[in-house]
């Protein structure tokens, strides 16, 4: 897949970050050999970090990679939550991407392996998919370092969403590591506007997948081993609020008219 106006595919990695000065440098270091590999194969790799009003040195950590990795920083003046940061990530990436490009999102806490992106793109092309989920629940996927409670919440949310608001091809509805075709994502952004991401917290990842997948986007998965043991610092998830928001999201999605995006 190439953009007609450009012979090169660009991978745009959009990272929502909040107080990740301890984890972000390690993740960006892992991106450097990936960028070299992609460029040697005739592709390009760019990173956009959306800083969601961090109170630590997250911005400085990202800017330290401007020369080595071409990182751009898009700041929020105040903390607005993961949903707003994801919305800005998608908007910023689409402003920079050609229709033939691909846009990836992942957590900025170094629990996801950016080295999977070429394989995810290969799966996307082989299956003519619009979205590839890096999935803990695909054959070969796993979770390392998660508490039993977090595992129950993640698996329970995906089970409930599969039961109540299924998306063909999806097992892992909540993981933030995904690869999207830019052209499809642009159609979705045009159709939904700012309403593409309405959830403020962690449920925003499921929301986007439901709106795209139930709007006709073709979804597949690639196995992910989530390395939560590499995370520096405590989780920012508010457990009870997240659970209540999943039930509210299901009600809203089941009642909504889904515009076609693919």
Annotate the PLM regions:
Residues 9-15, 24, 31, 44-50, ...:
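Hydrophobic targeting segments
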Residues 29-43:
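Short, acidic, metal-binding catalytic loop of nucleotide-sugar glycosyltransferases
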Residues 20-23, 54, 113:
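Donor nucleotide-sugar binding loop of glycosyltransferases
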Residues 39-53, 74-75:
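Short beta-strand/loop segment that forms part of the nucleotide-sugar
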Residues 76-95, 102, 114-198, 230-237, ...:
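Acceptor/aglycone-binding surface of glycosyltransferases and processive sugar-polymer synthases
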Residues 1-11, 191-262:
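Hydrophobic helical membrane-anchoring modules
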Residues 51-60, 78, 110:
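A conserved acidic beta->alpha catalytic loop
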């Amino acid at each position: 897949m190439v953009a007609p106006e450009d012979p090169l595919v660009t991978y745009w990695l959009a990272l929502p970050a909040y107080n990740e000065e301890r984890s972000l440098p390690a993740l960006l270091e892992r991106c450097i050999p990936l960028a070299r590999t992609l460029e040697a194969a005739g592709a390009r790799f760019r990173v956009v970090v959306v800083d969601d009003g961090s109170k630590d040195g997250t911005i400085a950590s990202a800017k330290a990679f401007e020369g080595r990795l071409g990182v751009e920083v898009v700041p929020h003046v105040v903390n607005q939550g993961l949903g707003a940061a994801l919305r800005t990530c998608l908007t910023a990436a689409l402003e920079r991407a050609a229709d033939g490009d691909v846009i990836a999102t992942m957590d900025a806490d170094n629990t996801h392996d950016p080295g999977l992106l070429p394989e995810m793109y290969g799966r996307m092309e082989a299956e003519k998919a619009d979205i590839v989920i890096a999935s803990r629940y695909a054959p070969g996927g796993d979770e390392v370092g998660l508490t039993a409670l977090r595992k129950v919440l993640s698996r329970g949310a995906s089970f409930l969403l599969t039961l109540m608001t299924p998306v063909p091809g999806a097992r892992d509805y909540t993981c933030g590591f995904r690869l999207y075709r830019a052209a499809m994502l642009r159609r979705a952004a045009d159709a939904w506007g700012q309403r593409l991401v309405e959830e403020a917290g962690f449920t925003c990842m499921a929301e986007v997948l439901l709106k795209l997948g139930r709007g006709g986007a073709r979804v597949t998965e690639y196995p992910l081993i989530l390395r939560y043991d590499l995370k520096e610092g405590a989780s920012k998830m508010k457990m009870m609020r997240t659970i209540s928001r999943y039930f509210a999201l299901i009600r809203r999605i089941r009642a909504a008219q889904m515009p076609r995006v693919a």
